[in-house]
A protein has these predicted regions:
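Broad gene-expression machinery/nucleic-acid interaction feature
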Residues: 4-6, 112, 123-129, 162, ...
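Gly/serine-rich nucleotide phosphate-binding loop at the start of the catalytic core
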Residues: 1-74
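Stable alpha-helical structural segments in soluble proteins, enriched in small hydrophobic residues
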Residues: 33, 74-86, 383-393
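Acidic carboxylate diad motif detector
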Residues: 49-170, 313, 317
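Positively charged, helix-rich recognition surfaces that bind polyanionic ligands
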Residues: 3, 17, 171-418
Length: 418
């Protein structure tokens, strides 16, 4: 199984120069190959320049030779993926006039593949190869005499097989890196009938039902607060900045470094919080002996729906696919099965109904956002959704199992540190 870790390391002036030059060369190689794809007919080429053609045709050119061979090939490969995505979008009609991949105005990250990385087990240092052309240029121009690039960080210590190392352009002596490494696959645990179901939402990010003890609990209440804080802060700064530009008569309003930093902080804060929430859930499943997690599949739930500009903003920013990915790989490390279950009518059917399907759906019983009333019985609406998701999974998979409804009234709210 492949995992990744992201961190930032300090680099010397010489290393920053080396990395910066390779990132610059990567952007120029991208632009050369991109121009070739956009204008291959005008340049008199007989066939469309795909990845296989470009990685051979540019092998002896300046920008290609300034990069390790596999790194240069990876730049061409990423461009190839971008063009394939463009053509697929054009065929599907998802966007009326999709634009082709753009030219890079700034340096771009570079990717070292496994062949260019040397790492001794249980050490915190990796050695990266440098191309001969780059070493010669650096010696003549900057008097930098480096045969290899050495990076040190404690995250390398626990890694046996590093598959990729993605390096971003240095900023103020720091360099962000993403390490992709491989760990042995964990064998899936035998199913013991102990399951957990998850209902994803906005106010309650994850409402969970434990089939073993009938317990329900809510995770991720701080997600919406984080989103709201950053949206308000970004709007405040944008209003000030755009007002200043308008007062000076600027015709085309531009963004600012402050606004870009706020967007980055928002992305990092939300991603960090989702990792903490999903890690808590994975640890809970491991401790309780749960062998299967069933999550409601809400993909395409936003399609062709207009719920008002405020709800639309919340709904469209919900990173449900990222949550699925985080849950799947964290649970896989413990051998726990992860399943996405279609969840139609799960929030409208009573937990006491014979089945979860359209004929038993009664939307009128959901009195308020968090209240479901069935006769004299009241339940938490999100807990009912999580409970019915598990019932629907049992129905689809042909499993007959009694589930308790005693914990659906008052779910426990679990607070995870932000």
């Amino acid at each position: 199984m492949l995992l990744s870790k992201k961190t930032s390391i300090k680099v010397s002036r010489e290393y920053a120069n080396l990395i910066g030059h390779m990132c610059y060369a990567a952007s120029k190689l991208w632009n050369v190959c991109n121009y070739e794809r956009q204008h291959y007919k005008e340049t008199g080429m007989e066939q469309y320049p795909d990845w296989y053609y470009q990685k051979k045709a540019h092998k002896e050119e300046l920008w290609y030779k300034q990069l390790p061979s596999q790194t240069a090939q990876e730049v061409c490969k990423l461009l190839d993926k971008a063009w394939k995505s463009f053509y697929a979008l054009k065929r599907s009609g998802g966007i009326e006039t999709p634009r082709p991949p753009r030219f890079k105005q700034e340096s771009i990250p570079i990717t070292y593949m496994q062949m260019g990385i040397v790492h001794e087990r249980d050490t915190d240092r990796v050695r990266l190869s440098l191309p001969k052309t780059l070493k010669k240029y650096m010696e003549e121009t900057y008097q930098i005499h480096e045969n290899f690039l050495y990076l040190e960080n404690k995250i390398f210590r626990g890694m046996d097989q590093i598959k990729q190392l993605r390096i971003y352009p240095p900023e103020k002596g720091n360099c962000k890196i993403i390490v992709v490494y491989e760990i042995p696959d964990q064998e899936e645990l035998p199913q013991n009938g102990h399951e957990l179901s998850i209902d994803l939402g906005l106010h309650n990010l994850m409402t969970c039902y434990d089939s073993g003890n009938g317990k329900t609990f809510i995770l991720g209440r701080k997600y919406l607060a984080l989103e709201r804080y950053f949206h308000k802060e970004i709007a405040r700064v944008q209003a000030q900045w755009y007002g200043q530009q308008s007062g000076k008569g600027v015709k085309y309003l531009a963004t600012s470094k402050h606004i870009r930093k706020l967007y980055k902080r928002k992305h990092d804060s939300v991603t960090d919080y989702l990792h903490k929430v999903t890690r808590y859930l994975a640890e809970y499943c491991r401790e309780q002996g749960i062998t299967c997690v069933v999550a409601g599949d809400i993909r395409n739930i936003r399609r062709e729906k207009d719920l008002g500009h405020r709800t639309n903003q919340k709904f469209h920013s919900l990173p449900y696919n990222g949550i699925y990915i985080m849950l799947e790989y964290k649970l896989k490390r413990y051998g726990i099965r992860f399943i996405k279950q279609e969840e139609s009518y799960t929030s409208q059917c009573s937990p006491l109904s014979p089945k979860v399907e359209k004929r038993y759906a009664e939307p009128s019983k959901r009195k308020e956002r968090g209240l479901y009333r069935d006769g004299n019985r009241t339940y938490n609406a999100d807990a009912v959704g999580a409970y019915n998701i598990l019932r629907k999974y049992h129905s689809v998979s042909g499993v007959k199992r009694e589930l308790s409804v005693t914990g659906l009234k008052t779910p426990e709210i679990i607070k995870v540190a932000v």
